[in-house]
Amino acid sequence: MEHLPYAEVWLRSADESAWREASRLARELGKDGLEVWTTDETPEVVSFLEPRGYEIVRRYVVSELDVAAAPEPEPPGVPLTTFALRPDLAEELYEIARESYPDQPGREQSRMASYESWRSWGLDPHPAKAFFIVLDGDRALGYGYLKVDGDQGYHGFTAIARASRGQGLAGAIKRAQIGWAKTNGLSTLRTANEVRLPQMLALNERYGYRPRYTEVVLRGPAA
């Protein structure tokens, strides 16, 4: 978000002092607005911010899968590899990420950072054996990765090249991720999907994910 006039902050209550402090820090960074994250479990935050010029720009349904209770997933059905086996595909993955990131609902103004910056948060911190890549011959068509914390897993960004969307590749990646989670003893998998992506929400429901809460993202002026 370096090129956007917003600094990100979480507010878990309608706390004016916290909002003003976040605004002060944002202005120190040269930002004149805030992108505030909260959840539908604290609706008072939205009620606090909207009269101050904020509007909701995105909503994410956070769903969870009980890995042990979930049925064994079907095979992916498409050629898959992992970043552990194909580290040479890093630059291709970056190009897919750069194309896909602004295609997300509510992120049309976003621009991907440099390759080096993207690697620092979008590639290198994540388990290479759980970083799945869809292949067409030697060419990457898409990817999806897991973040792992103890026995809990979290679906990171899933990106499919525009020309390859609508072919079930995201579902193939998700089946591979569920299989990996089972093999590696994870207890739960969590995922967050924008409410304007009904096909992804339906995919989660099909594989046994259950909604837990909704994250709400607002943008507006700093105090």
Indicate residue ranges for each PLM-predicted region.
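Conserved donor-binding loop and adjoining core beta-sheet/short helix segment
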Residues: 1-41, 136-162
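Acyl-donor-binding surface of acyltransferase catalytic domains
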Residues: 13-84, 216-220
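Conserved acetyl-CoA-binding loop-helix of GNAT-fold acetyltransferases
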Residues: 14-28, 160, 166-179, 202, ...
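Glycine-rich acetyl-CoA-binding "A-motif" of GNAT/NAT acetyltransferases
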Residues: 18, 128, 138-142, 199, ...
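Conserved GNAT acetyl-CoA-binding A-motif
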Residues: 29-39, 181-193
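Conserved active-site tyrosine of GNAT-family acetyltransferases
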Residues: 49, 204, 209
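Polar/charged side chains located within well-ordered beta-strands of beta-rich proteins
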Residues: 63, 97, 155, 174-177, ...
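Flexible, substrate/cofactor-facing loop regions flanked by secondary structure
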Residues: 76-153
